Amino acid sequence: MTLTIYKGRPGNITERQEREVRVYDLLDSIGVDYDRLDHAPAMTMEVCDAVNAAFGRMTLEEFKAEDSNDRTKHAIICKNLFLCNRQKTKFYLLMIPGDKKFLTKNLSAQINSARLSFAGEEDMLNFLDVTPGSVSVLGLMNDHGHIVQLLIDSDVLQSEYVGCHPCINTSSLRMKTKDLMEKVIPALQHEPVIVNL
């Protein structure tokens, strides 16, 4: 599967979903440069692997072993997990490297929360305006009540670039991690908590 990397938003947005266009509007309004890949829905490992290869993604182990001068060309493609406590009174969006193992008990201990589980599709739509497979840090732009707490695994911050969906799983974006932390997250008005998983 061959994918083409494009700079910025699509030239023609008439066929794009409104939630995706809002992401491009936000990124453009705050001066964030980003690369974009359009692809089949990222529901299979074949599609995810093709996106990862196009963006130059390495495994976490390869990334940590890489000479720091060579890291700049690689992006950490995140899996974004939408979590909640048992009572569904607290919601969390966790950004973690795609190949990093996630254990809920490790995270629960760090954020002083009771047992965590995955939030349902209805909560994804209500708080982030996304569907399963499309969860993204960029969905926080739709959390106007600031209900969702952003959690970022410290390994995400080690790469010069980070990859995520623009609230739809038929496109993927790559942007500088510095822009994510210094421009995007402040614009989303969701103060992150850094965790070590």
Model-derived segments and spans:
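Extended, low-hydrophobicity, polar/charged segments
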Residues: 1-197
